[in-house]
């Protein structure tokens, strides 16, 4: 069972997160940020990950700390669940349509985390959610997971759809990348012999 569990408490947030890579797409999410709950539920569903999350944050200030810290914890859970990374396909990508939006996501479980976005989100808010926090979330996730993540918005002008497409697309790309190729189950997919 490839599982990562993270408990992280700071002066700004108290987070408990459990991730199962080989799940069924069940999300049990309470981040304290309604829009992020919706996005993470979609991420779990499209990645076929089981994700349980509880976060108590200083949302009276704003949602920034909760969103970024959840990205940190999800990244750490991915890194933990992947272990030595033996047998994984390593790479995953998708070009995902959502109505007028077209989103490309590509992931490399390289051990060298980095986030490389090309997103043009027209609105500063979707409901009460600051749209710039989407990039903050993915940057924290990529850094902590050791995953190189590219997101390219190929079309779209609806801010909700653009953000939603990022979470769905990353879920699909990561599902491919974490899949075990059983013919090479004892090999790390790198000529270096390690992905760290």
Model-assigned labels for residue ranges:
Residues 1-196:
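Structural preference for solvent-exposed beta-strand-turn elements
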